[in-house]
Regions:
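Short acidic/polar alpha-helix capping motifs at helix-coil junctions
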Residues: 16, 41-44
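Short, charged/polar surface micro-motifs in flexible loops or helix N-caps
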Residues: 59-60, 97
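Short, flexible loop/turn motifs enriched in small residues
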Residues: 44-50
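Active-site-proximal loop/helix of nucleotide/amide-processing enzymes and allied scaffolds
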Residues: 1-27, 75-195
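Acidic/polar N-terminal loop/beta-strand segments that form early-domain functional surfaces
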Residues: 57, 67, 94
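Structured interaction and signal-relay segments at domain junctions
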Residues: 62-74
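Short beta-strand scaffold segments in enzyme catalytic cores
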Residues: 50-57, 118-122
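Short, basic/aromatic recognition patches
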Residues: 32-42
Length: 195
């Protein structure tokens, strides 16, 4: 159970808590659990640094990373996927400041790594201990210039995040991406025949 990032100056008991994140699971179709969110945020408070986890669609933690106060390195994760579709991996990370709105680097990572979704969680500043979060995802649509569009929701209370049907969202997005990919392939074939 490897922890990615700068961990050499982290106390051993905190490293053990980070390693324990690998043992937690999330129900299929649910973004996260209170237990996972709370543990990630407690470690974030102890370190003053971002913590990120990658989960697959079955809710298994695949990777844990530690960053600094503003960012966490999100390495590529090898996964099998059809061309143009999402990776089957979602990223949940903490924002030590409590401002869980997704940043430009968050959206850039979502687009580059083609996560199912990108979530940021934190403790709400005005209500001690209340967890809030934001979620970013592909819409399955393209702008006029061909750029794949992203959307986000939040900040939302943790209980609202748990009601998002992730399976439905991902299935809908992948269907749109597949339809667009099929149309693009048909357009290319048509152009090839006309040439």
């Amino acid at each position: 159970m490897q922890i990615n990032g700068e961990i050499q100056n982290i106390k051993q008991y905190i490293v053990k808590r980070l390693e324990a994140l690998y043992e937690l699971t999330v129900p299929i179709g649910q973004l996260s659990t209170h237990e996972l969110n709370a543990e990630m945020l407690e470690v974030t408070e102890l370190l003053g640094r971002e913590v990120a986890v990658y989960l697959n669609r079955r809710g298994k933690v695949l990777q844990v990373s530690v960053g600094d106060t503003d960012t966490v390195d999100l390495p590529e994760f090898k996964s099998r996927r059809a061309e143009g579709k999402l990776t089957g991996i979602r990223c949940i990370h903490t924002h030590p400041s409590g401002d869980t709105r997704l940043s430009e680097p968050d959206f850039s990572s979502l687009r580059r790594l083609r996560f199912d979704c990108m979530a940021a969680i934190g403790f709400r500043a005005d209500k001690a201990g209340e967890i809030v979060g934001s979620l970013g995802f592909f819409t399955g649509d393209c702008a006029e210039d061909g750029t794949e569009q992203l959307s986000s929701v939040g900040p939302l209370p943790e209980r609202a995040l748990h009601t998002i049907n992730l399976t439905y969202l991902i299935t809908t997005i992948n269907k749109k991406l597949s339809a667009r990919s099929t149309k693009s392939t048909e357009d290319e074939e048509e152009r090839a025949l006309l040439a």
